Amino acid sequence: MRGPIVLHICLAFCSLLLFSVATQCLAFPKIERRREIAHVHAEKGQSDKMNTDDLENSSVTSKQTPQLVVSEDPMMMSAVPSATSLNKAFSINKETQPGQAGLMQTERPGVSTPTESGVPSAEEVFGSSQPERISPESGLAKAMLTIAITATPSLTVDEKEELLTSTNFQPIVEEITETTKGFLKYMDNQSFATESQEGVGLGHSPSSYVNTKEMLTTNPKTEKFEADTDHRTTSFPGAESTAGSEPGSLTPDKEKPSQMTADNTQAAATKQPLETSEYTLSVEPETDSLLGAPEVTVSVSTAVPAASALSDEWDDTKLESVSRIRTPKLGDNEETQVRTEMSQTAQVSHEGMEGGQPWTEAAQVALGLPEGETHTGTALLIAHGNERSPAFTDQSSFTPTSLMEDMKVSIVNLLQSTGDFTESTKENDALFFLETTVSVSVYESEADQLLGNTMKDIITQEMTTAVQEPDATLSMVTQEQVATLELIRDSGKTEEEKEDPSPVSDVPGVTQLSRRWEPLATTISTTVVPLSFEVTPTVEEQMDTVTGPNEEFTPVLGSPVTPPGIMVGEPSISPALPALEASSERRTVVPSITRVNTAASYGLDQLESEEGQEDEDEEDEEDEDEEEEDEEEDEEDKDADSLDEGLDGDTELPGFTLPGITSQEPGLEEGNMDLLEGATYQVPDALEWEQQNQGLVRSWMEKLKDKAGYMSGMLVPVGVGIAGALFILGALYSIKVMNRRRRNGFKRHKRKQREFNSMQDRVMLLADSSEDEF
């Protein structure tokens, strides 16, 4: 039984991967450009705030591989369980040329300036252009990894200028497994919409990290980065930076599978998952680094370390917006629900860990980001739900997604993934405090920052048009960021996919970025779902409050705010995770996790029905084509038959014309019959005979061919059958004969023996008798 089951599982998995890749490829082209633009805008807005956020975030970065690059500031890449660099990745290589595969810059002081911080990571990873350059799969995977790495450097806040160089990151990317590649692809599209969009680099890399969890993608580099992650222990204000201390926790996440130095990077990741998220945000500001275009590091692939953290459940609980983002990219619910997967993984990995906390950190980071930096980061996270690998989830989010001009919240979503990382998350519970509560009406996102201050951004969600042109794309300040969300349609689907928040991850609420879009309330679903990128109203399900470590819970987000027409799921609050780290701060982060199941203004039903109709239409068309072909064949057969009949009729002495008579038709007038009586038939000339004969021969040949073809087709099987039967009969008969002979021979032998014995007996008797006589 085991063999068949394993085979089926393998086949299903392979088909899933192929399907996801295909869908991503289809979806990328349209969405890519908008996202890039959105990313750039978001990054610009964020860069201002970046410094503070970066500082906060820097504490954790060290452990994660991504962190390698950015030891401290790198938004605690390490925190991300698998190649936490995800978040870091956002800061796309500011300096690195898009063409270059990051890594160019070993080290980036970028920390000092907000923009700079984002850059280092980007450079290290590689220009956003890299994704384009890379083959779809490999390129994506690389892009993701690199991005994640980039994010770290950028995360390294100004204060944490120490962030290490990320030169190592590139190799990681290469190692990404195929699955990661697929996810990365998606990320690439979203994060690095185009080479030119380098700035936008957006850390899809987080998703790649998630992958690492699955595929170790980032591992090679992670090992290199271990040291960095270690030293970056900086803790957020509320959270303990135990970046180095908890290597193990991350590994549970799925980091282990990743080659990354499981312990170091993982530990860092676990401890700094939240931080990583924050850093991610800070990275976002690095819009300019690469092309001078905003890098929109916002990308912040929150999914980052918690490769699985972004699972749909997570998104629901953590990031409403993320969940929105997470559209079923592959149409596969599980996959589409990036959150669920991520959260699942996160939960599994962290179980006891603060699975949710990393998210909170991310949320904080989001808040920390400059206003209007909201960022699609969260959306990106989800995008990769399909991949399922934690890294992937990260990937999904991309800057453009963020609706709110300044929603730090969106970053929070991205961070959500990080939250998945176990222990780090705990530490980062404090990070949770950032309550990215965005009420639909108010669009206010409150997040307590790591420092413990609460940042409230009232987001005027003017992005009524989620589908705005890329130009309007999410300039951070411009709330039109929604533009990037032209994907809106699919978003509806994503929302549907949103699953109940995973109770396991406490962070859900935190990560949950409340994202409100006025009109559509469409959440940007940046899910990897290549085909359908829809922005579903993130607003509806967005509200989630994250409590800062030092602050009391702010249940503000506790009750999900639902925009009109949006259904909200009951919020579930997960108990604060025990602080794995003995962090002094009370990180009773009890992000109230609200799961909102909101159907985009386009009802999910509508989307589904539309898709269903399309499928039906396609099927109908195929059926019609088949029927037409059958009809054509039938017509041809009929034509051939009629021809044959005509030929047969003609061949029976057709048309010899009698003298003076033009018509051979039977309906001749009686008047002409008299003429016919005395008429003598003329033998047709040679030409006529030839034509007639040819017609006869042709018809006969066709008939023969038809029958002979049928017969010839039957001859082989019939002949083989007969031969087989004869052979079997012959074998049986031969066996019978052989047995008979043997039997006869045996009998003969016995008879002879008997006779011989009797003769011997006689001789002996004679001898005895003779002796007696003597």
From Swiss-Prot:
Residues 736-774 are cytoplasmic. It comes from the Eukaryota. Residues 41-52, 221-233 have a biased composition (Basic and acidic residues). Expressed in podocytes. InterPro entries: ARMH4. Residues 607-651 have a biased composition (Acidic residues). The keyword Cell cycle does not apply. The chain crosses the membrane at residues 715-735. Keywords: Glycoprotein, Membrane, Phosphoprotein, Signal, Transmembrane, Transmembrane helix. GO terms for cellular component: membrane. Residues 28-714 are extracellular. Residues 258-275 have a biased composition (Polar residues). It is a single-pass type I membrane protein. GO terms for biological process: regulation of inflammatory response; regulation of TORC2 signaling. Glycans are attached at residues 57, 189. GO terms for molecular function: TORC2 complex binding. Disulfide bonds: none annotated. Residues 41-63, 97-135, 221-275, 600-669 are annotated as: Disordered. Residues 1-27 form the signal peptide. It is found in: Membrane. Interacts with IL6ST; this interaction prevents IL6ST protein homodimerization and bridges ARMH4 with IL6R and STAT3 and therefore inhibits phosphorylation of STAT3 at 'Tyr-705'. Interacts (via cytoplasmic tail) with RICTOR; this interaction bridges ARMH4 to the mTORC2 complex and inhibits the mTORC2 kinase activity. May modulate immune response and may play a role in inflammation. Down-modulates STAT3 signaling throught direct interaction with IL6ST, resulting in the inhibition of phosphorylation of STAT3 at 'Tyr-705'. May negatively regulates AKT signaling by modulating the activity of mTORC2 complex through RICTOR interaction. PANTHER family: ARMADILLO-LIKE HELICAL DOMAIN-CONTAINING PROTEIN 4, FULL-LENGTH CDNA CLONE CS0DC025YL05 OF NEUROBLASTOMA. This is Armadillo-like helical domain-containing protein 4. It comes from Homo sapiens (Human).
